[in-house]
Amino acid sequence: MLAQFLRSLFRFRKTTVSVLLVATYVVVFLLNVWDRIRYQYSLPEDNKHHKQLLDASWIDLQSITRKPHPYTSRENDAVHDFLLHRVTELVEGAPHAEVSDDYKEGNHLVFKQPDVFNSSSTESRIVSFESSNIVVKITGSQPELPGLLISAHFDSVPTALGATDDGVGIVTLLALITRYAKKQPRRTLVFNLNNNEEFGLLGASAFLNHRWRPLVDYVLNLEGTGAGGKAVLFRTSDTNTASIYKNAVKTQPFGNSIYQQAFYDRYISSETDYKVYEQAGLRGWDIAFYKPRALYHTIKDSTQFTSQASLWNMMHASLQLADFIAFESFEDEPKDRSPAVYFDIIGTFFVTASTKDLFTLNCVVLSVIPVIILVLEFVIQRRKTRERNPLLVWLRLPFSMFISYLVTATFRSSLFRVNPLIFSRDYVSPTIGFSFTFLILNYLVLSLLEYLAPSRDLKTVSFVELFFGMWIALLWATIRLCTSKYTATGVYPITVLYLLMSFGAIVGLVCSAFKRKHSVVKAKDSEETAAPNTYSSIEESPQQATNTEAPNENSPEEHDERAPLLRASNSSQVSSVTNVSEAPSSALKAFVVSALNYDWSVQFLAVVPLASFFVIMCLSLILDGIYQTCQEGFQATWNVSKISMLGGMLLAIPVLPFCYKLNYFVSMVLLFAAASAGIFSFERAPFTESSPLKLRFSQELNLHDELGFSTVNVFGRQGAGIEQILRNIPSTQNAHSNVECTSNGQGSETCRYAGPRPHLVSSSSIPELSDILSIKVLSNNRKSSGRSSYEPINAELVINVKENRLCTIGFNSSQFAEHDYGQSPVKQVTIFGNAHHDNRTRSQLSTLDGLSRDDEENRIFKWNRGINSLQLHKLDFERNYYHVGIQWMPTILSQDADEESSDALGLKIRCFWGEYDSVSIINGEVKRKVPALDELLAYSPKEVSFSNREAGLVIVNDYIEL
């Protein structure tokens, strides 16, 4: 009985392969689901201290997310004051703690801000910024040790409440301050609760100007680029910092260096404060929420759509990491500062390695394993254990994969034409459709070829072919590692898959090389037809596949996978094999010969589960992060669909050597799953309330527009029905306003209509636009007879603007356009501390690039390579002006000057307002500040969400010429 059971269990037959495949997919699926939801069941119920921290943090989160609070709003000041009160309260009585408030201390900086999204950009943007960061210092008992900066930002965008971005990070900082105010750490910790991250990462830049900046060498940045879920280790500086995270975060570590490479390669277009700190020389960790993108920066970024489980997930990881750095000793060798490869395994294990070590490993396995394969092939050829005329067998898998790829690619192209935005709602269905379509087509082609010409070599030949395919992929990945200076931290899955395919190929070749030569088995049982004995595992012909009964006890027992692993003691069977050498006489040799026939089970169990798990783990992480970027344009949609298709095919590839052994039932299940996934992908609506269409709003007014139109701009994905949405709101229906949509040529469009005017400021009467914004030129010596034609031109102006915190000035001339061509003639800007013209400043101009101050503490910034734009921020709503000076060079000094060139300088002035969830009092009546946005939120379908397009919701424009 045992012999018959083992014979049936380990036989290379359709039922066994099918059961193992189904079991593999079920286990991998359950592990993936558990990894996704596990954090929801990990609240600190048994730890009183942690529970108190969590409860207090949740109350704090609710307090700071009552309203949107961008830097440009008064609510931003309310959040600042609340946080200042909280940290002062938390550190009270702690002699090793100190609080600094940039608002009171007047941290005003003027600096040239590099383009954090494009390191090769030559654009020169000068920023004048008044900071209101709250900085807390916890002095360590060993302050000589390198300190740790922990940072998060408390501003939100104008359209969001800022719960995940970045309220959770802020209240996590409050929890950490609570802990270390009571328990002094060894290292000094500095907490930067910074303001105005959303529009320029300016709060982080302001910290670099703070007196406590020299105390820290490490940084932990907490961010939210999604809305809830789990917080991931986006990136870390190097192998040392990755190892610190590994040693610190023992409970539910979560991170993957695939995301890190996406930042390196600029596939992720947004940035976090971590970039500023990294450029300043700090090393550390960037931990952030990363999905779903469609709720990010919308009104649904609120406590209603996140949870205490998400809060605890970020808080617990931060506590573990901060505790380790604060209290433990660790090595930080300079030699281990190459970029790191890292990933977690279902939140239980964390693996990290140097990319240089990965490069070395790749070089070794690229060289050694092919030699092993070739040696085994040579042995097989010498021993003649391979069947004759193998060329057609070697062509089967490439032919099958080619046909399957063509059909799968056609499926993807059709989906891209019919329902391209389905990925924004659900990437799982298309990916399953791609994967199972590819698998079932390979099954059909390979099964047909096997039926027409049975082969005993197909499985191992397939592994060898897949090995060489992965060899090419690994060669590319290794070259990529080298050429990227080891920043390609996301290529490690190729190494893993290469090693797995290599193992499968080597096992098959070893078993083939040391088996007996080709022979024919003669079975007395009429139910067993003659079959070759054995190269690799004996593979049934289609006629044999239907016969699953065990052979008669009196029939000969073959030395193949149908034999039991251990012989029965009373066995009296004899071999009836022809054309073979004498059977092994010893029981050990007989066992080895018999065991060699079970190579298929070793191959399957080692390759398919591990490869499937690894592919699903990496693919789900990638698609989780990018699937809703398909709303950003044609190219983004194409990229998401391509990754989904290639990932689905990669999931099927480890099964290909075995797929022709799937039975009818499983093949029909796969076919049904592929068809169902395809139908869902084609027919379902791409947007739902939980996965909405994300549109971006702005409203613009031009100061000298005689008609006084207030233009509402709605930006979004072309083909998503934006025009129809806008035609169904009261403003366009009642006033018969025309909706005009223009494409940007890349899959996005901007639709415009005349909307209700905003009410930006309170007034006793209906204010004119010129009452809100006006430009006054105080001086301009361009046409002065006292100025030499070779002398720089100087001008001063005041921008009078009410209840405002942000204006920008873009420069252009006859030879220069702000973002298009030429070098700006503007070489110097001055930020005056008052609104009054003062000629004394002109004689004190700096001759060096950079920032200087005059006797009146006016800030002067000089940049001889040209200044493209000036960004002006201020904190005081009651100071209704910006006073600036501008110096530019006459065209006569330009090599590109011509007769039509003019010395005139054009100024495009834009001022931004970011409040909408508040009111103004106009002529005694209560008016909502931005009724156009209120209208869109009220009357748009529930499947639509809105975010801001610009730094403010309302922009007032003016243009003057100096």
Swiss-Prot record:
The keyword Electron transport does not apply. Residues 531-563 are annotated as: Disordered. It comes from the Eukaryota. Its EC number is 3.4.-.-. It is a multi-pass membrane protein. The chain crosses the membrane at residues 15-35, 360-380, 391-411, 432-452, 461-481, 490-510, 602-622, 640-660, 662-682. May be involved in vacuolar sorting and osmoregulation. This is Vacuolar membrane protease. It comes from Lachancea thermotolerans (strain ATCC 56472 / CBS 6340 / NRRL Y-8284). The lineage of its organism: Eukaryota, Fungi, Dikarya, Ascomycota, Saccharomycotina.
